[in-house]
């Protein structure tokens, strides 16, 4: 009988609620438990580089897992995309648009672009829509997308660019056009320092399984795996989520997309 292990998992703040649900299913299927620590991707990356004893890292981008790979800190072949995030504009109790926000004096909450991938995506969106210069002085930056959400839900900031996965039934929000920010492609890796490589590999296989991906989709993310002809799961080509082609940004479409009648 296999020994049940406890895996220490560093997870981007936006994915923590989803991971908590996944952890229950993973324990039911394998007996292994997860000890979850959540923060912004940038903070977790710095902790890992400085020797934090995690087995697995679930990032909100693919750049930092790639940097860990370049440093020789991950198990070979362990980097996989597990989800794609999506930005929404959210103002509790009333709907708004970015163009309306541009023209009024309301503060806007975003995650800190320097350490949080959702914040970088928000900055790209605002810059490519020509709105950044109007709202920059009114930005309130959270240390993570979770803190950004808390700014808005508490009423301290009236509107925010947050993750779709943070919305619940009944929330009114506007999905931002993904053409205007680079894909929020969330990757995971197994750290080379892990003392539980077999259990960690089981976790990666579980996250990429059809049942886990269905749960991830139900939490507001895009699934990034599909079944191959032989029934095995493979990562999708992200053709419809390609990086921004800034030369093709259509200002007329911006107005028609974001201004209400």
Predicted regions and their residues:
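Exported/periplasmic ABC-transporter solute-binding proteins
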Residues: 2-29, 35-38, 42, 46-52, ...
């Amino acid at each position: 009988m296999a020994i049940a292990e406890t895996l220490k998992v560093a997870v981007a703040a936006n994915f923590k609620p989803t991971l908590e649900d996944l952890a229950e299913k993973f324990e039911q299927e394998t007996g292994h438990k997860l000890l979850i620590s959540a923060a912004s991707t940038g903070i977790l990356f710095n902790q890992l580089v400085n020797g934090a004893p995690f087995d697995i890292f679930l990032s909100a981008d693919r750049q930092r897992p790639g940097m860990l790979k370049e440093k020789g800190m991950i198990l070979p072949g362990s980097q996989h995309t597990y989800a794609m995030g999506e930005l929404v504009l959210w103002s509790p109790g009333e709907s708004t648009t970015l163009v309306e926000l541009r023209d009024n004096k309301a503060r806007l909450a975003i995650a800190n672009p320097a350490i949080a991938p959702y914040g970088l995506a928000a900055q790209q969106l605002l810059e490519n829509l020509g709105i950044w210069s109007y709202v920059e002085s009114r930005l309130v930056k959270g240390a993570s997308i979770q803190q950004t959400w808390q700014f808005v839900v508490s009423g301290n900031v009236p509107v925010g660019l947050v993750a779709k996965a943070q919305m619940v039934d009944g929330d009114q929000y506007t999905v931002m056009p993904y053409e205007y920010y680079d894909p929020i492609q969330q990757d995971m890796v197994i750290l080379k320092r892990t003392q539980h490589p077999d259990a960690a590999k089981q976790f990666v296989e579980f996250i990429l399984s059809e049942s886990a991906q269905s749960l991830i989709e139900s939490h507001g993310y895009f699934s990034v795996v599909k079944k191959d002809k032989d029934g095995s799961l493979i990562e999708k080509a992200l053709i419809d989520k390609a990086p921004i082609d800034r030369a093709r940004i259509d200002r007329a479409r911006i107005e028609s997309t974001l201004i209400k009648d």
